[in-house]
């Protein structure tokens, strides 16, 4: 058997209003509604954001691979893009994608105190995943944000 460890998967259909809402759908909704977003810390905190199509691709490749015979126990593969994106860059990318779709969002982020326990930086090492299941992320962070913003603009019912 194979284990897959997912890093910050995002994309269409994520609930921006749930109690465990991920940052990307939450910020997209707030920005579409022309409301401020909050960033804890200085915005340099970073994550390895992975567009959903990359995660689906990894699942399919893992299901079809025969390349795990070299492992004594079932291997665990990281599923991500293999790069760090700061929260400040995330804000700029969403803002840019909204602008490309005719929405001008001009509200600056509200910076709050860094939250105790938050991890400052997270980046996956995907070399094992690339080597054994031949995973190569097809969607960059930027293209994933663009597709996600476009989906929310077309499909998400926004509440006042």
What name fits each language-model region?
Residues 16-17:
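Active-site loop immediately N-terminal to the catalytic Tyr-X3-Lys motif
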Residues 1-12:
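Conserved beta-loop-beta element that borders a ligand/cofactor-binding pocket
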Residues 26:
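Alpha-helical scaffold segments in soluble metabolic enzymes
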